[in-house]
């Protein structure tokens, strides 16, 4: 019975078990012609005992069930070829999430047709379809393949089909590059197809398909096969019966959304990338584009110009035996030494080639692709860091050190000498400075590369092509990026291998110096990386601290004024320690704090190197806010309490008085003990940091470059000393480099706190040595002097750079006459006194001004010029000892008493010849001073103050070199010993002023 107005379905007989129990999704696609619906209805009416009404009801029930199943006829579309060549019709599966081009590509390759040379039309439409549309929307439709409308193209297609070799025509890509996603389609035809298929114009040519819309859009299952052969001619009738039943699906096909266009652009970029990479494979790797300079440096031009020359320089013989004549006569140890040296040269050349592969294959290709508009989102510097700088430094190292060693061996046919490498490895710290940046950024480069490989299809295709290149030697990009730090850590191993096989003492010293230079640089790199990690950890902790709320404001005005100071900078340097030291997080955890008798709260504490933070967690967030002022670790007294799991923190101020007490309760006794021990360890660690860099004398670590410069100057001056010894000149007259000093107060002459003068007095006594009891327990044993010595000993400068002092060398200690004490650095600036010793007052110095923290870089002090020393030198005496000598109270064999203040000496020792009141003009010529020399008296001061006879003094004056006539000494007045000498008015005035100031200050202190 025929029912008009009902939707017609191709249903199996009602009695079929398959139709009742098996879903059509599990059945294979039907390729046989469909059975006429009227015959099925008649059979069903007979099986239903003639009850047509019940049959109709059954049909309506089946109709409801069929709405939720897939129609097998919508799983495929029919492809007909309207060409002059007879080609069999194909039934192609309409796959979901596949473009039309991707589905048709295997069919066209099998039939030998180039997909880009034909046009695809939908049923009776005259508008070519775009190959980027999704294929599943064409299910149940006819697609016709026609020759393009352009004149002359049809003949080309037919000629390609008739040619026996036409099977290779559609594969336009070279062999080995892999099939692309789909062939390039003419851009103009694609643009026209998009314009024709616009929503405003599609009804003009497709009106017959926009009729009934009774069946909603259904998604066909994805078949397993790529294409199905045509079964019989009945499939054409089946396709005709589908025509008007998929209007909704067909209308959805024309809605070209942004996803479709984005997919098309991605396909275009992939095709363009494959074409570029194929060009690089055929015609060679490109040069770095002139418009794109990596890191804005000029290394690329030099690199391009000298590449051929470098290739020639990097060519090595197969073995070191080809360089040396008579290698058969060498001992076994010499052969092993040559093997070790050759390994150093060979691995260096191989490493330079690896760096060149990274630059030429990966970096230059990437920059050329970016110039073409591909992979522009990739940051080359973030991916490769400063590898070009590393390649450049190794080229310089090879050209200046390695290549000359090889050329010398080739020219002389002699052994490879390890000492020839000393020139380059001695400057290892300054030459290899780019490695510091690369090692610190290497982890970030690796992470960035992994992210690109995971998310960027174009980058993944580019890296896959590059890693398959013959130059890469099957290495991954990650392996190539790890080469620099591996090479850096391999240098000490190679040099130690050379050292073990070397017997000559001079060569051993050179290799040891090279190993020391390399290891110092590696330690410096490790320290930089460790500090960087600590800064990152500290930054992570800082990000968790939300606010600083330790002060409660009483009004809005107070709140506004406080707002400027309510902050805490945990990244600031540790007070009293070196600026290079980074604050570390030692312990963190939750505690229960009790402040007072009743106040209890849950807190979260952070223990750093120098402070303890008490914070409170913010609700619904992993952040905290500071609720108590930071507690300095060195002012905390920690004690455990009898209550299990409790400990007390007493906070002291600068006067060592308690200003706060906090009781903390941990969750267990072990955790409580851990907090107490960690606080003690933090206090010890902070004390060590401040002991290494005491306040007021903080000296940053020397840079490697300055250290190497200092070593060079030291060697040059050693050579000058050797030359001076050969010519009979005393070694004491050659300049010696003292250790470097910063702008800190201890490295310079200590400034007095007033406009006072500092006398530099030298008193010479024969027989005194540096280890005299007065030096050990006298005025030189003050605490400030010990600090100066410890600072000198703990300096980073090598001990060989300190001024060597012999057993008879004297020292001149500067003393602040205003206080009668030695300056803190008086023992660091020892200069041997000249033969013309006299009282030399220093210029008045301005009061101290608080100086800013010392800069991280050290400044080199001007080399101290040493004067020739007399044969018998003695250490300096204090002013008190000098006055005793002036009073005639000492013989040159008796050690002087400990120093006393000048005021005490003036009261205890009567000196009738010295006046402390009145002006020098009033004193006149009768103002004498025992043992005080006249200006320019020269060694007479030494002899007279030590009680030496005047005759011996005259004898020594006769030993002066020619051309230096001694000054004529005035005859002493009658009745005065020859040991007495007169002082000039200026000298007497200075002594008087100094004595007055010292007496005044001493009296004020009492």
From Swiss-Prot:
GO terms for cellular component: axon; cell-cell junction; cytoplasm; cytosol; endocytic vesicle; lamellipodium; perinuclear region of cytoplasm; plasma membrane. Residues 584-684 form the PH domain. Residues 727-754, 769-785 have a biased composition (Polar residues). The keyword Cytoplasm applies. GO terms for molecular function: guanyl-nucleotide exchange factor activity. The modification Phosphothreonine is found at residue 729. SMART domains: PH (SM00233), RhoGEF (SM00325). The keyword ATP-binding does not apply. SUPFAM superfamilies: DBL homology domain (DH-domain), PH domain-like, Ubiquitin-like. It comes from the Eukaryota. It comes from Homo sapiens (Human). It is linked to Neuronopathy, distal hereditary motor, autosomal recessive 4: A form of distal hereditary motor neuronopathy, a heterogeneous group of neuromuscular disorders caused by selective degeneration of motor neurons in the anterior horn of the spinal cord, without sensory deficit in the posterior horn. The overall clinical picture consists of a classical distal muscular atrophy syndrome in the legs without clinical sensory loss. The disease starts with weakness and wasting of distal muscles of the anterior tibial and peroneal compartments of the legs. Charcot-Marie-Tooth disease, recessive intermediate C: A form of Charcot-Marie-Tooth disease, a disorder of the peripheral nervous system, characterized by progressive weakness and atrophy, initially of the peroneal muscles and later of the distal muscles of the arms. Recessive intermediate forms of Charcot-Marie-Tooth disease are characterized by clinical and pathologic features intermediate between demyelinating and axonal peripheral neuropathies, and motor median nerve conduction velocities ranging from 25 to 45 m/sec. Residues 847-856 have a biased composition (Pro residues). This is Pleckstrin homology domain-containing family G member 5. Residues 224-242, 786-803 have a biased composition (Low complexity). Interacts with GIPC1/synectin and RHOA. The gene is PLEKHG5. Residues 36-45, 704-726 have a biased composition (Acidic residues). PROSITE patterns: DH_2, PH_DOMAIN. Residues 336-528 form the DH domain. It is found in: Cytoplasm; Cytoplasm, Perinuclear region; Cell membrane; Cell junction. The modification Phosphoserine is found at residues 734, 851, 876, 881. Keywords: Cell junction, Cell membrane, Cell projection, Charcot-Marie-Tooth disease, Cytoplasm, Disease variant, Membrane, Neurodegeneration, Neuropathy, Phosphoprotein. Residues 151-165, 183-194 have a biased composition (Basic and acidic residues). Predominantly expressed in the peripheral nervous system and brain. Highest expression is observed in heart, lung, kidney, testis and moderate expression is present in spleen, pancreas, skeletal muscle, ovary and liver. Weakly expressed in glioblastoma (GBM) cell lines.
């Amino acid at each position: 019975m025929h029912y008009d107005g009902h939707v017609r379905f191709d249903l199996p007989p009602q009695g079929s078990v398959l139709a009742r129990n098996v879903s059509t999704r599990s059945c294979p696609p039907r390729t046989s012609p469909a059975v006429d619906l009227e015959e099925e209805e008649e059979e069903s009416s007979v099986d239903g005992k003639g009850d047509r009404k019940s049959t109709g009801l059954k049909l309506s029930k089946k109709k409801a069930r069929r709405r939720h199943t897939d129609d097998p006829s919508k799983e495929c579309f029919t492809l007909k070829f309207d060409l002059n060549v007879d080609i069999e019709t194909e039934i192609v599966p309409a796959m979901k999430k596949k473009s039309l081009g991707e589905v048709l590509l295997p069919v066209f390759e099998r039939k030998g047709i180039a997909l880009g040379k034909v046009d695809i039309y939908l049923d009776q439409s005259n508008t070519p379809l775009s190959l980027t549309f999704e294929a599943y929307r064409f299910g149940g439709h006819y697609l016709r393949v026609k020759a393009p409308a352009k004149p002359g193209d049809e003949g080309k297609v037919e000629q390609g089909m008739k040619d026996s070799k036409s099977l290779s025509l559609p594969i336009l890509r070279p062999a080995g590059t892999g099939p692309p996603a789909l062939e390039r389609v003419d851009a103009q035809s694609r643009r026209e197809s998009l314009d024709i298929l616009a929503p405003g114009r599609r009804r003009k040519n497709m009106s017959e398909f926009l009729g009934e819309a009774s069946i909603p859009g259904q998604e066909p299952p994805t078949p397993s096969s790529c294409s199905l052969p045509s079964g019989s001619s009945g499939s054409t009738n089946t396709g005709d019966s589908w025509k008007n039943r998929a209007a909704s699906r067909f209308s959805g096909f024309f809605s070209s959304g942004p996803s479709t266009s984005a997919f098309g652009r991605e396909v275009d970029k992939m095709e363009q990338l494959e074409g570029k990479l194929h060009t690089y494979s055929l015609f060679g790797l490109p040069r770095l584009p002139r418009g794109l300079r990596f890191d804005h440096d000029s290394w690329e031009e030099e690199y391009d110009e000298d590449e051929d020359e470098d290739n020639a320089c990097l060519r090595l013989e197969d073995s070191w035996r080809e360089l040396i004549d008579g290698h058969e006569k060498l001992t076994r140890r010499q052969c092993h030494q040559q093997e070790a040296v050759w390994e150093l040269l060979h691995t260096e050349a191989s490493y330079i080639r690896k760096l060149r592969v990274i630059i030429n294959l990966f970096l230059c290709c990437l920059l050329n692709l970016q110039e073409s508009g591909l992979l522009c989102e990739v940051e080359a510097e973030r991916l490769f860091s400063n590898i070009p700088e590393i390649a450049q430094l190794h080229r310089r190292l090879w050209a200046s050190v390695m290549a000359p060693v090889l050329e010398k061996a080739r020219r002389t046919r002699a052994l490879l000498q390890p000492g020839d490498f000393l020139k380059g490895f001695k400057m290892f710290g300054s030459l290899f400075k780019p490695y510091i940046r690369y090692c610190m950024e290497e982890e970030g480069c690796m992470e960035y590369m992994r992210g690109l490989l995971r998310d960027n299809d174009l980058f993944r295709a580019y890296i896959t092509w590059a890693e398959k290149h013959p130059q890469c030697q099957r290495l991954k990009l990650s392996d190539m990026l790890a080469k620099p730090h591996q090479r850096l850590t391999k240098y000490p191993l190679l040099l130690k291998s050379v050292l073990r096989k070397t017997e000559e003492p001079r060569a051993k010293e050179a290799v040891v110096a090279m190993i020391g230079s390399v290891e110092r640089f590696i330690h410096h790199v490790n320290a930089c990386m460790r500090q960087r990690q600590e800064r990152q950890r500290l930054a992570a902790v800082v990000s968790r601290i939300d606010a600083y709320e330790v002060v409660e404001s009483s009004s809005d005005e107070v709140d506004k004024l406080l707002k400027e100071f309510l902050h805490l900078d945990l990244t600031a340097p540790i007070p009293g320690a070196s600026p290079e030291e980074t604050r570390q997080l030692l312990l963190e955890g939750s505690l229960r704090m009790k402040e007072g008798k009743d106040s209890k709260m849950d807190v979260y504490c952070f223990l750093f190197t120098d402070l303890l933070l008490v914070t409170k967690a913010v609700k619904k967030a992993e952040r905290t806010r500071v609720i108590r002022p930071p507690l300095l670790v060195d002012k905390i007294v920690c004690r455990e309490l009898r209550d299990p799991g409790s400990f007390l923190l007493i906070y002291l101020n600068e006067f060592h008085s308690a200003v706060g007490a906090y009781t903390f309760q941990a969750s267990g006794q072990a955790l409580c003990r851990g907090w107490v021990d960690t606080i003690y360890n933090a206090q010890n660690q902070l004390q060590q940091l401040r002991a290494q860099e005491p306040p007021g004398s903080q000296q940053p670590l020397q840079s490697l470059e300055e250290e190497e410069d200092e070593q060079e100057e030291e060697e040059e001056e050693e050579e000058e000393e050797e030359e001076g010894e050969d010519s009979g000149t005393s070694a004491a007259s050659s300049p010696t480099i003292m250790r470097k000093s910063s702008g800190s107060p201890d490295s310079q002459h200590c400034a007095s706190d007033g406009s006072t003068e500092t006398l530099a007095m030298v008193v010479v006594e024969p027989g005194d040595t540096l280890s005299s009891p007065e030096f050990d327990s006298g005025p030189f044993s003050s605490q400030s002097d010990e600090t100066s010595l410890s600072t000198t000993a703990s300096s980073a400068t090598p001990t060989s750079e300190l001024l060597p002092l012999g057993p008879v060398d004297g020292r001149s200690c500067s003393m602040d006459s205003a206080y009668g004490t030695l300056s803190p650095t008086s023992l660091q600036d020892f200069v041997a006194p000249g033969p013309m010793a006299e009282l030399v007052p220093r210029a008045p110095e301005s009061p101290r001004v608080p100086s800013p923290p010392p800069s991280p870089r050290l400044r080199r002090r001007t080399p101290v010029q040493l004067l020739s020393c007399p044969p018998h030198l003695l250490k300096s005496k204090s002013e008190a000892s000098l006055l005793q000598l002036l009073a005639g109270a000492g013989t040159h064999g008796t050690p002087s008493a400990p120093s006393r203040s000048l005021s005490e000496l003036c009261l205890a020792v009567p000196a009738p010849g010295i006046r402390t009141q009145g002006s020098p003009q009033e004193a006149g010529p009768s103002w004498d001073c025992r043992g005080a020399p006249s200006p320019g008296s020269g060694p007479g001061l030494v002899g007279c103050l030590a009680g030496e006879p005047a005759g011996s003094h005259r004898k020594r004056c006769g030993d002066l070199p020619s051309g230096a006539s001694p000054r004529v000494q005035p005859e002493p007045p009658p009745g005065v010993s020859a040991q007495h000498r007169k002082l000039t008015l200026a000298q007497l005035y200075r002594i008087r002023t100094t004595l007055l100031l010292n007496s005044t200050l001493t009296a004020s202190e009492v």
